[in-house]
Every structure is written in C-alpha cells, then in structure tokens.
From Swiss-Prot:
Its EC number is 6.3.4.19. Ligates lysine onto the cytidine present at position 34 of the AUA codon-specific tRNA(Ile) that contains the anticodon CAU, in an ATP-dependent manner. Cytidine is converted to lysidine, thus changing the amino acid specificity of the tRNA from methionine to isoleucine. GO terms for cellular component: cytoplasm. This is tRNA(Ile)-lysidine synthase.
C-alpha cells in the first residue's frame, strides 16, 4: 500500500525513537537486506502501552510495521484500571484488535488503583506505570513505547504551569526516560492527535474513545472531569481562539527548548550534589566526625532507628554555585530522602546557606527539619539533631 504523508512521518518518528534507545543496534543483519524475513521467536521485544484509544492504536500499528522491518518483536501491554463500567470489555476489544494487527505478545494486566491523597488521576497513573514496568520485566522487553502526542505535550505544559513554576513546568514530557529500571519512549511527540486519527483511518484500525475525555460534551466540562480533559476540551481551545494561531505546536516547541535547559541544569546540579551532599540510610554509624564536613545523621542521634534518610549539605561547597543550581541541589537531595518540600521551604534552606545570621531551622514534611551548624546543614527527622 502507498503510505500517506502522516503515516510516513509516524514510521520515521518510531524508527528515530528506537535509534535513540539503541534498538537499531539489535537489528538482525538479514533485515538490512531486501526480501521477506521472518522475525525470530527470540528476537528483542518492544512493548507498546495501549489503551485502545486512537493514539495508542496508531502507535501499535506503526510500531509493528517498523519493528517487523527491523527483525524486532513488537507486543502490547494493556492495563485495565477497573475505574469505568465495561473497562474489562474495552481491554478485551483492544487486545483483539492488536492481535489482528499481528502484534504479540498481547498482555492484559489489571491494576489496583488506591488514591491516598494525591488524587485519582495520579493514583491511576502510578498504578499504570507499576503494571507497565512489571510487564516489561516479566517479558524481557527492551523498551515500552507510550503514545503521547504533540497535543498531550501542550496539555502537559499547561498543567505544569497550573501546578508549579519554573523551567521544569515548561519542560513537559521527555522523549526517553527510565522508571524502575525500565526504558520508556514517546515516539509520537512530533505528531498531532489529528494525525494519529488519520493514521487509524489510513490503516483501517478501529479505536475506542474514552468518555472521560469529554469529547461529546457541549460547553465547558464540569469540574469533576479529569484536569487533563478540561485543559484539552476547554483551556487549549480558548487560548487558541485568543492567540489566533496553533498554540499546540507553540507549547510543544517551547517544551522541547525548555527540556534542553532542564537537562543541563539537572546534570550540573547532580555533579554538585555528588560533591556537596552525603546521604545515608538508617541505621548508620554514630561515630563522631568533624562538623565542618558533610555527614549523615547518625542512628545514635535518635531512639527510633526507622527515621529513614539523613542528609548533610556542605555549605562551603554549595555556596559557590548560582541560585538556580543551589535550589536544584537542595530539592533533589530532599526528594532523594523522600521529603516533598515546597518551593518556600527549599528557598528557606537556601537562606541557611547564603543569608546565615543564626536563624532557626526549617520545618519540613514527614517530621524532618533542616538546621545549620557551622559549615554543614543537617536534614534529619525530629530528634536527630540533638547533641550535634
């Protein structure tokens, strides 16, 4: 069949992404030659995360085309969250459509979604990634492909700006990332949702429309719809009407540029963190050390050995860095210790570094606090600062 321009674009995007995760290096030599070749049963495996929607069905179909041409197996993993009536049927129909396209293995997993304060959307996302990672490890997949499009990227930027600030909010979703030891990639970030819809039409692929997207709703979506659906249905179109141009492409390109900045800042802050921060899990040695050097909070400082992770931040080392790097080092170190601090709390710790005048410590979540003594800032759970 003759490929449409959008289908050729998608094929190129998937092939480029597989190159980015070094999958082209595993291509069987015979597949570089013309002719018909069968994919070996023990060939490397790529999985596509598939919901049955237009984006993921388009990605599944295109990935199968590309992987088959490379001698790589292409399967799918379908996660049933069990949050909607009939979700089992939707998952089953998606599985049958993927089998009809020739994908294999077709893996269907049931997720348990438990919202514990972070909201249902976040809990469902965490449960989904847990199942995707488990499926990848159990099947030995080299990578899992996600079907996020340029439209999803624009929505992510707006959601990021609503929920946070700075370059991280603008950076959107990375094309390639690792989670729990599993490589994930997003080949379709350069394609629009209209293009994935067209690809399904080109290939005769049926798909399911999630009713929570609100596509069939006239007027603004009620507040009980997912935030992403409301951004997609209401906010983006309103901004586009106001701006008078394609803001989806504009936001997606802004995300690409911001991500380059973010990756450099992250790399630099990681280098500084390696020199300025010491992290030790409990229990740790309570041997005395100099207060001028970073060290972990010792188990001997508290009666509870379950206090978690202690941090020691060298003031002399971190003070030499620009504010952008200092704040990232502090934020990354706290995150590594399992402390989800606010921007105001991170800034207060930074003042212990650059504006030290004997002020008290900074209270943090989970019973942690940050206190400066001489040239070291200690981040420990309450009680662990005693006698130090």
């Amino acid at each position: 069949m003759a490929y449409s321009a959008r289908l050729r674009k998608a094929v190129g995007a998937v092939r480029t992404t597989l190159s980015a995760v070094e999958l082209c290096d595993v291509q069987a030599p015979e597949f570089a030659q013309h002719g018909d070749h069968a994919v070996a049963s023990d060939a490397p495996l790529v999985l596509v995360a598939c919901s049955g929607g237009r984006d993921s069905m388009a990605l599944a179909a295109v990935s199968h085309i590309v992987c088959t041409s490379m001698g790589v197996r292409c399967g799918v993993v379908i996660v049933d969250h069990g949050l909607q009536e009939g979700s089992e049927q939707v998952a089953g129909e998606a599985a049958n459509r993927c089998r009809a396209l020739g994908l294999g293995p077709v893996i269907v997993r049931n997720a348990t979604v438990q919202a514990r304060g972070e909201g249902l959307e976040a809990a469902a996302r965490q449960a989904r990634y847990n199942e995707l990672c488990a499926a990848a490890r159990e099947s030995g997949a080299i990578a899992v492909l996600l079907a996020h499009t340029m439209d999803d990227q624009a929505e992510t930027v707006l959601i990021g700006l609503l929920r946070s600030r700075g370059v991280d909010a603008l950076a959107g979703m990375p094309q390639v990332f690792t989670r729990s030891g599993v490589t994930f990639a997003r080949p379709l970030l350069t394609l629009t949702r209209a293009e994935t819809t067209g690809i399904c039409e080109d290939l005769g692929v049926e798909y399911w429309d999630d009713p929570t997207n609100g596509d069939a709703v006239d007027g603004e979506l009620p507040n009980d719809y997912p935030l992403r659906s409301r951004v997609r249905h209401d906010l983006l179109p309103a901004i586009e009407r106001f701006a008078g141009f394609n803001v989806t492409r504009h936001f997606a390109e802004s995300a690409r540029l911001a991500r380059m900045d973010k990756e450099y800042l992250d790399q630099r802050s990681d280098e500084v963190m390696g020199e300025a921060v010491t992290t030790v899990d409990w229990p740790a040695s309570s041997a005395a050390v100099s207060t001028d050097t970073p060290r972990a909070c010792a188990a001997g400082d508290t009666n509870d050995s379950s206090h978690g992770v202690g941090l020691m931040i060298s003031v002399r080392r971190i003070a030499r860095e620009p504010e952008a790097i200092r704040l990232r080092v502090i934020a990354h170190a706290l995150s590594q210790a399992g402390v989800n601090a606010s921007a105001a709390q991170i800034a207060a710790i930074d003042r212990l570094v650059v504006d030290w005048h004997g002020q008290g410590g900074v209270s943090l979540p989970r019973g942690y606090s940050a206190n400066r003594k001489k040239h070291v800032i200690r981040v420990c759970q309450d009680g662990a600062h005693a006698n130090r």
